[in-house]
Amino acid sequence: MNKLNEALKKAEHIVFLTGAGVSVPSGIPDYRSKNGLYAGMSSPEYMLSHTCLVREPEKFYQFVTENMYYPDAEPNAIHTKMAEIEAEKDVTIITQNIDGLHEKAGSKKVVNFHGSLYHCYCQKCGMSVTAEEYLKSDIHSGCGGVIRPDVVLYEEAIPESAIDQSLAAIRQADLIVIVGTSFRVSPFCNLTDYRNKKARIFAVNKEQISLPYPFEMMESDAVKVFAEI
């Protein structure tokens, strides 16, 4: 049994911090790797910015619907194992991903730190709109307003509710497991600064990450690691 298995068995309050590397095995590209979403694109950050949404809503809509949605993607071993652990323990998943795969796998306590593509709303009347409706048109059939996905765009702040839920879970956790992220994007990478100092931290990632305090690094394929838990 590896150290992570042992720690998961002993822990009572677990937080998983997940990034793009968790969803890549499900066929969803990450952003910045050589085969990622941004590869070969001239201004992807602008296309996913608040400015683009306001100034060029048609261009924003085309980019998002053509590049961001993978409705046929299925959870992989990482998602399903985390959901299984949640059935037995107090587990909170705080994810940078916006693809809804943790929920699709059955996880209930998920903080979508950057929002979710599968929650959309009309900017004019505030009504919730299904992703299916948004994928057909970004104009709300009810009031004619422009629909947007409830995700955090460049130039936008993380919702306070997501930060509050994340900090509450982090402070209570006796085990924190960072999975599939380089853990360099702020404020997500600052969450562990608010941990209970007795909490153990593990990181499972294909590349080494760095933290300013002790943690256990598993430089490995997260799918293999979670398939063996």
Curated annotation (Swiss-Prot):
Q: Where does nicotinamide bind?
A: I98, D99
InterPro entries of this UniProt entry?
DHS-like_NAD/FAD-binding_dom, NAD-dep_sirtuin_deacylases, Sirtuin, Sirtuin_cat_small_dom_sf, Sirtuin_class_U, Ssirtuin_cat_dom
| Positions of the catalytic residues | H114
Task: Spell out the Pfam families in the cross-references.
Answer: SIR2
Q: Which SUPFAM superfamilies does the entry mention?
A: DHS-like NAD/FAD-binding domain
- Record EC number: 2.3.1.286
Q: Which family does it belong to?
A: Belongs to the sirtuin family. Class U subfamily.
Query: What does this protein's UniProt record list under function?
Result: NAD-dependent protein deacetylase which modulates the activities of several enzymes which are inactive in their acetylated form.
This chain belongs to the protein called: NAD-dependent protein deacetylase
